[in-house]
Regions:
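Interfacial juxtamembrane loops and adjacent helix segments
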Residues: 1-47, 294-295
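Transmembrane-helix signature of polytopic, membrane-embedded enzymes
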Residues: 40-43, 62-82
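Specific aromatic-rich, kink-prone transmembrane helix
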Residues: 63, 98-115, 126-129, 316
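Membrane-interface alpha helices of multi-pass inner-membrane proteins
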Residues: 86, 120-138, 143-152
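Short acidic/glycine- and proline-prone juxtamembrane loop motifs at membrane-interface regions
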Residues: 90-97
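Perimembrane helix-loop-helix junctions
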Residues: 107-117, 141-169
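Hydrophobic alpha-helical membrane-interfacial segments at the cytosolic entry of transmembrane helices
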Residues: 122-130, 156-181, 266-276
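Membrane-lumen/periplasm interface segments of multi-pass, membrane-embedded glycan/lipid transferases
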Residues: 164, 168, 175-256
Length: 335
């Protein structure tokens, strides 16, 4: 691109570089800065950025696996499947979102298995983790809300308020000023007009979201390579087997509906959160890349990429967290 076309972002002008919070690219920036200090070529600098991004992803992935009480192998499997490994070794932020989501799920599972109330430092760390997820992409931070459903025996109301407070303060002090002054997002259509169309026809908009989600799920069977379809089927079967084993070993028979919901609250939450996160990024793509007014009633949103689903995968492991209310300490059999 000619230098005359490069836009330096400030209070009045923005470009593609500030579509994301600056700290989102800190892993890549570390590698690039080191490469610049040792006078490597521009190409080598980009490769160094990829390497540093991969290293930090691996560190956070190992932390999530170590923190998870059980089913560590399943978490490791999710973190190394080819699509995730690809984005983790690229310059994109998707790999870090996967790692942060995995750490959040592992932290919730570990807290649920505690025999005492979570400490204040751990609460602060959990709030920072939720803030980091929200800074990456707000839709992927929905999983952090699952912490509010932890039993009071391990996370009291006060701790939950502190958790929300830490995340809110960080958002207000660090993220919101940047968002107001510098944040921007590219769009091929008039987003304001799309919003008015969506609000005027909510049922049709919801229908487009649902159809786009179904299309995204069935796309593997028709367009992607066979190995990708096989991998997806294997992952689903492994998760279902782990879920059946967990339910069977925790005795779910002959329970009142209220007791069942309390015991398997995180299974319900995992399915709801996963659907909400997918619907959120589908809606975002629909609002920014599609003209809702000119779309047919049964059309699907264009521009949805499969990599958007990858950060949702760790959320399903949240469904393996089981709350045992038979003891005062309320433990969890997490994956």
């Amino acid at each position: 691109m000619p230098a005359s076309q490069i836009v330096v972002p400030n209070e009045t002008r923005s470009n593609r570089s500030n579509a994301y919070f600056p700290l989102d690219y800190l892993p890549q920036a570390i590698g690039m800065k080191i490469a610049m200090l040792v006078n490597l070529s521009p190409y080598a600098q980009w490769q160094a950025a990829r390497i540093s991004n991969s290293i930090l992803y691996a560190i956070m992935g190992c932390f999530a696996i170590a923190l998870l009480p059980r089913w560590k192998t399943l978490m490791a499997l999710l973190l190394v499947i080819p699509p995730v490994a690809f984005v983790a070794s690229s310059l994109m932020i998707d790999g870090m979102i996967v790692a942060l989501s995995a750490c959040m799920v592992a932290a919730i599972a570990a807290i649920a298995g505690n025999k005492h109330v979570i400490s204040l430092p751990c609460t602060v760390a959990l709030g920072v983790l939720a803030w980091a997820l929200a800074c990456e992409k707000l839709s992927y931070a929905f999983v952090a809300g699952a912490a509010l459903f932890l039993p009071s025996a391990v996370m009291t109301v006060r701790r939950k308020v502190e958790f929300v407070g830490v995340a809110a303060v960080l958002m207000g002090v660090l993220y919101l000023p940047w968002s107001v002054l510098f944040s921007s997002s590219l769009a091929q259509v008039n987003v304001s007009h799309n919003m008015s169309v969506a609000l005027s026809h909510p049922i049709l908009t919801i229908g487009k979201i649902v159809r786009s989600m179904i299309f995204l799920g069935t796309y593997h069977l028709t367009q992607l390579p066979v190995w990708y379809t096989v991998m997806s089927v294997v992952l689903v079967l492994v998760w279902l087997a782990a879920l059946v084993y967990t339910v069977k070993t925790t005795g779910a028979v002959r329970m009142a509906p209220s007791a069942w919901v309390g015991k398997y609250r995180f299974l319900i939450l995992a399915l709801v959160i996963a659907a909400a996160e997918i619907a959120a990024f589908v809606l975002f793509v629909g609002m920014t890349w599609n003209d809702l007014e000119s779309m047919s009633r049964f059309g699907v949103f264009q521009g949805i990429q499969g990599r958007y689903v990858l950060p949702v995968l760790p959320v399903f492991l949240l469904g393996l967290v089981i709350v045992d209310d038979r003891k005062v300490s309320q433990r969890a059999l997490a994956c």
